[in-house]
Amino acid sequence: MNKLSITATFICTVLLGSAVALPSHAGELRVTWKEPTSFTDVRPSNESRARFRERTLEALEAHLVELAASLPKSHTLSMVVTNIDLAGQVWPSQFIGFGNNMGTDVRVIQRVDIPRMTFSYSLTDSSGKVLKSEDDFQLKDMGFMDTNIR
């Protein structure tokens, strides 16, 4: 997996208002989802928002654990995710020519609707020394439709 693909996978990282400590086989990953209900776009198309957040979070946690496995054993990556904007926009199906007035929605994804994520992070070693950190890091994947992440 190339660096762009790994970076793009972080864009999916969303939802839940509490800190989650995810131990891995190598380093440690700590993620805090700061006010996920105020994220720009974590809107479901055809399910409740709460269930969508729960389902999305479960998938993202599993993927983050995979990524954390590449950290050196003595390192800890701490992230505070402050915003998520998923690719595309959710529209009522009748607005785009699908379905009828049954209340279903559809997420329409076009090349210009790129996924974005804003977060702060800190990578520390076993002594607590900060190896790398950044505040309000803005990640976006303009080529998300051209790559196969999984």
Model-derived features: positions:
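Sec/Tat signal peptide C-region and signal peptidase I cleavage site
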Residues: 20-26
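N-terminal segment of the mature soluble domain
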Residues: 33-86
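Short secondary-structure boundary motifs at beta->alpha junctions and helix caps
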Residues: 46, 132-150
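Surface-exposed short loop/turn segments
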Residues: 81-126
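Bacterial N-terminal signal peptides
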Residues: 9-19
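A short, structured loop/turn motif at beta-sheet edges
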Residues: 69-77, 122-133
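Bacterial N-terminal signal peptides that target proteins for export
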Residues: 1-11
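Outer-membrane beta-barrel proteins
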Residues: 42, 88-91, 144-148
